[in-house]
C-alpha cells in the first residue's frame, strides 16, 4: 500500500459503481464503512449527474466491529430490495470492509431474494478501478446470458452491440452519440448498448448480434472475450478515436456487412485540410508527451504522429493490464513506454523528456503547469471541466475535429503569449508607446516642476506581473498616488497601497 495525495484510479468497487450507475434497474449493495460514501460525489459533483448512484452502503462504524456486521449487511440488502425494487442486484465489499471477510455474496444468497443477485469478488489491494468495472460488466453479462443458446444469425441484417460506455467515463456520452450516428450511415443496426442505459434483461439479448464493438477495452474487453468464446461473436477492437482510426473502424464495419464505405462519410471532418496547409508547418516536429489510460494514450499518439506531425517524446499509461499494448505502440515511435501509477514518476519522466506539449490526465495538467508546459487533458481521471454540458466527443469524425482543436490550441495560444513576452520591452511596442497610427500631442507647458518619482527594480518587476492590458493604468495610478503622498521612490508596498487607495 502507498500513501499518496493522488491516484489515477480508485479501488475496484468504484469501477463496480460506475457500471451499476450506468445501467437502469440495477442496484449495488456495498459493505463499507461510513467514510466510503464519498464515492457519491464522483457522480453528482464531478460528472454532474442529476441523481445519486444506485448504491446502498452498510455504513458500519468502529463500534459495530465488535458486534455482528454480517447481520448489518443482510439488513441492508433486504432494505434495499424493499425500497428500490431493482431488477437485479450486485453485492460486494469496499477495500476497508474486505478486511473483515463477511462474504457479502453468501450472505445475500441466503436471503433468497426473487431477483438475480450477482456477487463480486474484487481484490481491492491488488486491482483498481478499471479492472473492477470490467469484472463487474463481465459478471453481469455472464449471469444474464447463462442458459441462452447461441442464436442462428443467418439471413438477418447485420447487427452489433456497443460495449464499454459507462458512468463517469471520459466523453463516453458524446462518443456514443457519434458512433451510433456513424453506424447508422454505414447501414448497421445496434442490438444492445451496455452498460450505459441498459437493463439487466437487455444483456440477455447480447448474443443475438453478429459482433461486439469494444469501444473502451479497459471496461469491455473481458466481457467481449467471454462472448466471443461462448457465442462465437466477432470482436471489433478498433477504437474510432482520430481521423485515421475512424476510417479503419468504418472499413472494419463495412467488411462485416459486405458493403462499401459511403463516399460522403467524411463530410464532417474539418481537420485534414489544415494538416496539409502551409500554416501547419509551425506544428510539425513539436515534441509531445502522452500519458493516460491505454486506449486514449495509444489513440492520441497515432493522431499526434500521423495526423498533425508531432514528434512523440514520451508515451505511457497507468493501466498495467494493457502494458503490452502500450509498449508495442511506443516502439512505433522509438520511445520507451512508461508504465506507472505514481504521479511523481510521471512528473520526472515529463521533466526529463522536455516536451513542448503534454497530453494527459488532470494530474498532468498540474504537472505541466508547474513545469511551464502547455497541456491538454485527453484521458480520465479528470475534473469537472472535462465533463462538459456541451457535445464534445473524441470518437468519430466530429471527435477528430474536437481533438484537432484540443491538441493545437495550447501551442497556438502559447505562441501568442511568447510573442507578447518577446516584444514587451520593444521601443515601438512596449506598454508606454503610443499607437503608431496616432499623432503625438504637443506637450503642455508645465507651470511648476512636479515631484519626480522613481521605481525600485523590485517594484518594476512586480508591475510586470500585472496583465499587460491593465498595466498602464496600474502604473499611472501608482505614480499619481506617489506624487500626492510625496513618495519619491516607488516600492512594492507603494503599488499595493495605491491599489488599496483607488479600490475604495
From Swiss-Prot:
Cofactor: [4Fe-4S] cluster
GO aspect biological process, one term: light-independent bacteriochlorophyll biosynthetic process
Binding site for substrate: 414-415
Catalytically driven reaction(s): chlorophyllide a + oxidized 2[4Fe-4S]-[ferredoxin] + 2 ADP + 2 phosphate = protochlorophyllide a + reduced 2[4Fe-4S]-[ferredoxin] + 2 ATP + 2 H2O
Chain positions recorded as [4Fe-4S] cluster binding sites: 36
Keywords: 4Fe-4S, ATP-binding, Bacteriochlorophyll biosynthesis, Chlorophyll biosynthesis, Iron, Iron-sulfur, Metal-binding, Nucleotide-binding, Oxidoreductase, Photosynthesis
Enzyme class: oxidoreductase
Coiled-coil region(s): none
UniProt xrefs under InterPro entries: ChlB/BchB/BchZ (IPR050152), LI-POR_suB-like_C (IPR013580), Nase/OxRdtase_comp1 (IPR000510), P-CP_red_C (IPR042298), Protochl_reductB (IPR005969), Protochlorophyllide_Rdtase (IPR016209)
Active site: residue positions: 279 (proton donor)
Note on how the cofactor is bound: Binds 1 [4Fe-4S] cluster per heterodimer. The cluster is bound at the heterodimer interface by residues from both subunits.
EC number(s) on file: 1.3.7.7
Pathway: Porphyrin-containing compound metabolism; bacteriochlorophyll biosynthesis (light-independent)
Molecular functions (GO terms): 4 iron, 4 sulfur cluster binding; ATP binding; metal ion binding; oxidoreductase activity, acting on iron-sulfur proteins as donors; oxidoreductase activity, acting on the CH-CH group of donors, iron-sulfur protein as acceptor
Assembly and oligomerization: Protochlorophyllide reductase is composed of three subunits; BchL, BchN and BchB. Forms a heterotetramer of two BchB and two BchN subunits.
Family recorded in the similarity comment: Belongs to the ChlB/BchB/BchZ family.
Chain's role: Component of the dark-operative protochlorophyllide reductase (DPOR) that uses Mg-ATP and reduced ferredoxin to reduce ring D of protochlorophyllide (Pchlide) to form chlorophyllide a (Chlide). This reaction is light-independent. The NB-protein (BchN-BchB) is the catalytic component of the complex.
Name of the molecule in the record: Light-independent protochlorophyllide reductase subunit B
Lineage, broadest ranks: Bacteria, Pseudomonadati, Pseudomonadota, Alphaproteobacteria, Acetobacterales
Amino acid at each position: 500500500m502507498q500513501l499518496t495525495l493522488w491516484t489515477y484510479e480508485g479501488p475496484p468497487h468504484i469501477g463496480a459503481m460506475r457500471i451499476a450507475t450506468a445501467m437502469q434497474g440495477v442496484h449495488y449493495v456495498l459493505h463499507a464503512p461510513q467514510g466510503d460514501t464519498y464515492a457519491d460525489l464522483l457522480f453528482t459533483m464531478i460528472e454532474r449527474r442529476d441523481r445519486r448512484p444506485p448504491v446502498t452502503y452498510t455504513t458500519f462504524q468502529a463500534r459495530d466491529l465488535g458486534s455482528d456486521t454480517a447481520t448489518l449487511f443482510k439488513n441492508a440488502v433486504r432494505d434495499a430490495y424493499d425500497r428500490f425494487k431493482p431488477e437485479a442486484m450486485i453485492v460486494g465489499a469496499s477495500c476497508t470492509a474486505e478486511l473483515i471477510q463477511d462474504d457479502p455474496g453468501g450472505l445475500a444468497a441466503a436471503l433468497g431474494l426473487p431477483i438475480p443477485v450477482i456477487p463480486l469478488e474484487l481484490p481491492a489491494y491488488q486491482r483498481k478501478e478499471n479492472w473492477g468495472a470490467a469484472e463487474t460488466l463481465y459478471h453481469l453479462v455472464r449471469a444474464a446470458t447463462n442458459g441462452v443458446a447461441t442464436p442462428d444469425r443467418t439471413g438477418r441484417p447485420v447487427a452489433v452491440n456497443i460495449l464499454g460506455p459507462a458512468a463517469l467515463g471520459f466523453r463516453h456520452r458524446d462518443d456514443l452519440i457519434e458512433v451510433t450516428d456513424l453506424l447508422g450511415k454505414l447501414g448497421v443496426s445496434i442490438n444492445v448498448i451496455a452498460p450505459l442505459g441498459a437493463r439487466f434483461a437487455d444483456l440477455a439479448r447480447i448474443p443475438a448480434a453478429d459482433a461486439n464493438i469494444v469501444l473502451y477495452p479497459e471496461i469491455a474487453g473481458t466481457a467481449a472475450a467471454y462472448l466471443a468464446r461462448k457465442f462465437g461473436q466477432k470482436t471489433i477492437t478498433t477504437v474510432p478515436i482520430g481521423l485515421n482510426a475512424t476510417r479503419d473502424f468504418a472499413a472494419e464495419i463495412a467488411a462485416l456487412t459486405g458493403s462499401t464505405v459511403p463516399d460522403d462519410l467524411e463530410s464532417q471532418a474539418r481537420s485534414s485540410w489544415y494538416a496539409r496547409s502551409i500554416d501547419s508547418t509551425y506544428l510539425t516536429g513539436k515534441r509531445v508527451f502522452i500519458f493516460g489510460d491505454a486506449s486514449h494514450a495509444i489513440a492520441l499518439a497515432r493522431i499526434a504522429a500521423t495526423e498533425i506531425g508531432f514528434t512523440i517524446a514520451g508515451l505511457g499509461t497507468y493501466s498495467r493490464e494493457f502494458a503490452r499494448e502500450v509498449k508495442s505502440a511506443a516502439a512505433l515511435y522509438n520511445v520507451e513506454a512508461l508504465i506507472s501509477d505514481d504521479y511523481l514518476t510521471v512528473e520526472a519522466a515529463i521533466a526529463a523528456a522536455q516536451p513542448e506539449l503534454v497530453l494527459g490526465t488532470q494530474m498532468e495538467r498540474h504537472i505541466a503547469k508547474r513545469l511551464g508546459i502547455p497541456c491538454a487533458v485527453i484521458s480520465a481521471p479528470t475534473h469537472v471541466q472535462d465533463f462538459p454540458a456541451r457535445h464534445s466527443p473524441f470518437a468519430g469524425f466530429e471527435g477528430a475535429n474536437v481533438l484537432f482543436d484540443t491538441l493545437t490550441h495550447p501551442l497556438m495560444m502559447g505562441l501568442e503569449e511568447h510573442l507578447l513576452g518577446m516584444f514587451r520591452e520593444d521601443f515601438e511596442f512596449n506598454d508606454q508607446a503610443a499607437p503608431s497610427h496616432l499623432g503625438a500631442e504637443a506637450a503642455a507647458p508645465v507651470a511648476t516642476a512636479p515631484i519626480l518619482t522613481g521605481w525600485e527594480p523590485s517594484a518594476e518587476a512586480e508591475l510586470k506581473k500585472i496583465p499587460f492590458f491593465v498595466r498602464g493604468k496600474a502604473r499611472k495610478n501608482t505614480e499619481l498616488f506617489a506624487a500626492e503622498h510625496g513618495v519619491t521612490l516607488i516600492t512594492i508596498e507603494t503599488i499595493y497601497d495605491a491599489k488599496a487607495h483607488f479600490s475604495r
